[in-house]
């Protein structure tokens, strides 16, 4: 028919390099199994940051208290 353009066949778009295809493949698979949702990010921050810092701080406070309580008077 006159005036109707036949669409080109599929596959004539841009050619993506193989390395970029490979990177995208692994990225999609990683995201499918582990998504960085706000809940997961918050849990990681608490487990990796807050808990160890609190543990270290409280341990240091305990050591300071032992030093203060067990301190002897200076002998002159």
From Swiss-Prot:
It is found in: Membrane. GO terms for cellular component: membrane. Keywords: Membrane, Transmembrane, Transmembrane helix. It is a single-pass membrane protein. The chain crosses the membrane at residues 40-60. This is Uncharacterized transmembrane protein DDB_G0286421. It comes from Dictyostelium discoideum.
């Amino acid at each position: 028919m006159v005036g109707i353009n036949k669409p080109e066949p599929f596959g004539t778009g841009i050619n993506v390099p193989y390395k970029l295809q490979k990177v995208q493949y692994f990225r999609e698979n990683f995201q499918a199994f582990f998504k960085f949702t706000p809940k997961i990010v918050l849990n990681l921050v608490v487990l990796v940051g807050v808990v160890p810092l609190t543990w270290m701080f409280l341990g240091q406070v305990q050591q300071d208290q032992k030093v203060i309580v067990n301190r002897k008077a200076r002998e002159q």
